[in-house]
Amino acid sequence: MEPLLLGRGLIVYLMFLLLKFSKAIEIPSSVQQVPTIIKQSKVQVAFPFDEYFQIECEAKGNPEPTFSWTKDGNPFYFTDHRIIPSNNSGTFRIPNEGHISHFQGKYRCFASNKLGIAMSEEIEFIVPSVPKFPKEKIDPLEVEEGDPIVLPCNPPKGLPPLHIYWMNIELEHIEQDERVYMSQKGDLYFANVEEKDSRNDYCCFAAFPRLRTIVQKMPMKLTVNSSNSIKQRKPKLLLPPTESGSESSITILKGEILLLECFAEGLPTPQVDWNKIGGDLPKGRETKENYGKTLKIENVSYQDKGNYRCTASNFLGTATHDFHVIVEEPPRWTKKPQSAVYSTGSNGILLCEAEGEPQPTIKWRVNGSPVDNHPFAGDVVFPREISFTNLQPNHTAVYQCEASNVHGTILANANIDVVDVRPLIQTKDGENYATVVGYSAFLHCEFFASPEAVVSWQKVEEVKPLEGRRYHIYENGTLQINRTTEEDAGSYSCWVENAIGKTAVTANLDIRNATKLRVSPKNPRIPKLHMLELHCESKCDSHLKHSLKLSWSKDGEAFEINGTEDGRIIIDGANLTISNVTLEDQGIYCCSAHTALDSAADITQVTVLDVPDPPENLHLSERQNRSVRLTWEAGADHNSNISEYIVEFEGNKEEPGRWEELTRVQGKKTTVILPLAPFVRYQFRVIAVNEVGRSQPSQPSDHHETPPAAPDRNPQNIRVQASQPKEMIIKWEPLKSMEQNGPGLEYRVTWKPQGAPVEWEEETVTNHTLRVMTPAVYAPYDVKVQAINQLGSGPDPQSVTLYSGEDYPDTAPVIHGVDVINSTLVKVTWSTVPKDRVHGRLKGYQINWWKTKSLLDGRTHPKEVNILRFSGQRNSGMVPSLDAFSEFHLTVLAYNSKGAGPESEPYIFQTPEGVPEQPTFLKVIKVDKDTATLSWGLPKKLNGNLTGYLLQYQIINDTYEIGELNDINITTPSKPSWHLSNLNATTKYKFYLRACTSQGCGKPITEESSTLGEGSKGIGKISGVNLTQKTHPIEVFEPGAEHIVRLMTKNWGDNDSIFQDVIETRGREYAGLYDDISTQGWFIGLMCAIALLTLLLLTVCFVKRNRGGKYSVKEKEDLHPDPEIQSVKDETFGEYSDSDEKPLKGSLRSLNRDMQPTESADSLVEYGEGDHGLFSEDGSFIGAYAGSKEKGSVESNGSSTATFPLRA
């Protein structure tokens, strides 16, 4: 594949070079030459709507040409001051101002120098007038219902194209159909009018897009009078009009669109059909439009000329019209005259041929004048050629060939330059070239020489010119070196020589390494809907890396750059990824590399695997009572061999429509003999399997029905259902419909006591259950069940042992003792129940126990029975998870499949003391530079008499080392806090607290805190403020500093604050202002009013709290929930609020401005004096051992606030 692509790229490059090398001779601008027009306006220029219009004419030549114009064949001078000529060209502009209609006409540009004159084609400049409908009074039209009528439009003339519309005054289009039609001229035809056609606002609009103009005809009124007798009539052509006769001629230019239209009046409305007389309408280019009234043929050719017939018909008759179509063509070049360069004394021919219909006439001009005015000795002028002999420099001229017929004129200029000059090499000296090893190199040496010159190439270090099959020199001087090697690198010289002189240039050639590619993985096999990942590894010459571009294609079609199908295909440079591959993604993938000098490619074959197609054409043969042959045809395997076939059947009377697997067949086989059961109406289907998965099932086969037979098997799983004592309910698995083998299925059940010398009892039933009464409880029986149907009995059944129904145990176990293992675990032992008193199959023993009272406080406990079962025959069991230091009652009973027997007499035992649980909380409520005060809550479960606490602490500064653990035994169990002294300043400590009983200490609760620094000023304390006070003076040591003020109740739990604020004191220069205000009478009165109101609110608050009023805990929990506090909430004594984790509702800014919402803010209570009583949620006093909160701020339903003006 790679050589193929390389070769293809080489061919394209060679074709480009050949076109480059075979172009017309380009005379260097330094050589004298006749003028050549290189740019001109279109042959028709319409008046534009821009600020000016421009007619272009540009030419080249040596000497520089001068320009002149003619208008309508007469010289045109730029005398009008509005004309703006361009420098160095013949282009001029006319501003769009004033009256410019006199500029309309046909212009021609002439470019001349001393050697000749070139002329442009005629440029028609059109200044259209603004089209208008004439102002006229249009008489109303009145017709009878069913009559035909034509509404004329007669649009004004204007610059084409013209678009005509019929609308009403509301600019709604008049609906056209088989009855109503607008002709190409714009007239509106009615084949027969109806009453609904009456209206007074039929308006014809003419639109001229190039003029950006739409004009409207005066509205027309049409009245349709209803008629009681509408006469039907045969068709009559209205278009073409009657005066044109039964046939007409139309001339159309080749390549244009032919439109033939036919419209007939009549009632019922005639239908129009088209045909070509003596031929067929051109397929693919003809269409019938406007309900068949218009025949449209696009891109008309000479084959379309001839006679076309339209036929309008209804059931009363027909009307026809023939169109004779003539196809003509404006002139077009078949041999356009070509410019040429000749040397003195040479000969030449100038050819000019054109075709058209009618045949164009040819006229020759020399320098814009008829050729007859410029006779040259030896020249022969024919209608289609001029023959030159012994050319001389004075033959240099511009020859014009003009071809014309009735449809237009075309003009071509051909320069004849007679010059003698030594070679002029156009390629720059010292040009650098590069190619790739194995590719061809092209070294250019473009030149101009007259007379003709000889070109030779040689390597700079060599004397002889290059020769051999690897070298080729083109006519324009380019050297081609085929199949380059590294030895071809170097400098080359190009020599060009003619009769007048010799010239040379040098060129340098570099040889690069070829680009290489490798696509991986090679030929992958990908399951459908998996991901395909291809990688393209490239290697190229270091000089070419900047130009290296990779692209991907599939089966020769390139992928888009950014992928397709909503990102399913992603191309990222060298990587191609396709998600959810489908069978359409299978193919040959090619990675192509292109550099500035070469290209390379590599391919990989991607195979997509899928499940097979379903098998087809299922056929049944060799039909037998117990077998049939099934044959099928394999479907497509989708690139993965079929490993096996699964044959399924449907025929189960119990589950119709359910398919079951019958057998499996190896993938190479497509036929199998299927074993069948009697009395089944079978239908089969086949599923193919390959490594990807299963196919869809095939279409079902024909039905095959087998005859009935006696049962082949007996019921299985014979058992006893739970039943009453002295009763045996025998059950078994009934035979499925596929196992019954025939109609009338029944079951013969026989039984007898096991080992008893009695006859078998027997009963036949149709269902799969039989109830048998027995004289004994839980006695063994031999039981047999046999299947029978109308065709006979099944095989002899095997006997099974079943037991009659159980009864409850009638004796309770006797408890021998309860051994206490520890405070929460005991071992119970009992005597087993005799087998004959179990009355069934013993399943185990059950222990019931319940707590009667706590030994800690002596309170009785409501009976809540706990149950623990032990399976099997045993006489002891362990009872865990008991409460320590408590009294329990315990009973034991036996149970079988029927149920539980009687309980034993209750056994009373007590559990000893255990270790307590951890305290409910531990917090540091006060800290200084060398002391700390800790407070804690009572454990939720004491598990005995509390003897005290073990407090431990150690230094845990932010290092890997920790300090020595210090122990403090607190022997006062009622003490809820402890004051530590002799701590280090600015040090972080970790505290551990355990509650203890006589059995030891429980799990610790921990807390961390840091002491203050040496320079800390601590907390300023204020003496008590009574309820009637509204202000209190505070001495401030630093005027202008911020101070935190918190107001607390004296005896509330944890010294909860009811107000806090951050206040900035002023400097001393403002002290007088506050002194003066405080002595004013109005200020004293205001403060008294505020104090009275505050006292009233606080009194209400305290009364509500003492009466158990609830404050909004839920509201505060919703503001800032704390998951850690929430998890602990249910484990503490009683209820408590975590509102200390949230700011007080209605309070001002936080004490610590940097504190996060979920952090706890320190309260002044941490630094308060003495112990503080605790309140429960309802505000009542609990005492030292009541449930407590870690931190809290009390919120009442109507919270009070207080202000504290400071005086500096």
UniProtKB/Swiss-Prot annotation:
PTM characteristics: Cleavage by metalloprotease ADAM8 in the extracellular part generates 2 soluble forms (125 kDa and 165 kDa) in vitro and is inhibited by metalloprotease inhibitors. Cleaved by BACE1.
Q: Which residues carry this modification: Phosphoserine?
A: S1147, S1160, S1180
Q: Where is the Fibronectin type-III domain?
A: 614-709, 714-807, 809-914, 918-1015
What InterPro entries has UniProt attached to this entry?
Answer: FN3_dom, FN3_sf, Ig-like_dom, Ig-like_dom_sf, Ig-like_fold, Ig_I-set, Ig_sub, Ig_sub2
Q: Which Pfam families match?
A: Bravo_FIGEY, fn3, I-set, ig, Ig_3
Gene3D superfamilies in UniProt? Immunoglobulins
- Which subcellular locations apply to this protein? Cell membrane
Q: Give the residue interval(s) assigned to the motif FIG[AQ]Y.
A: 1181-1185
Q: Where is this region: Disordered?
A: 693-716, 1131-1163, 1189-1208
Give the tissue specificity: Expressed in the fetal and adult brain as well as in Schwann cell culture. Also detected in adult peripheral tissues.
Q: What disulfide bonds does the UniProt entry report for this chain? A: C57-C109, C153-C204, C262-C310, C352-C401, C445-C494, C536-C591
Domain of life (superkingdom): Eukaryota
- GO terms classed as biological process: adult locomotory behavior; axon guidance; cell adhesion; cognition; exploration behavior; negative regulation of neuron apoptotic process; neuron migration; signal transduction
- Major subcellular location class: membrane
The entry annotates sugar attachment on N299, N476, N482, N562, N580, N767, N822, N945, N1026
- Report the transmembrane regions from the record: 1083-1103
Per UniProt, subunit arrangement is: May interact with L1CAM. May interact with ITGB1/ITGA1 heterodimer and ITGB1/ITGA2 heterodimer as well as with ANK3.
Q: Which PANTHER family match?
A: CTX-RELATED TYPE I TRANSMEMBRANE PROTEIN, NEURAL CELL ADHESION MOLECULE L1-LIKE PROTEIN
What is this protein's record name?
A: Neural cell adhesion molecule L1-like protein
Q: Which organism is it from?
A: Homo sapiens (Human)
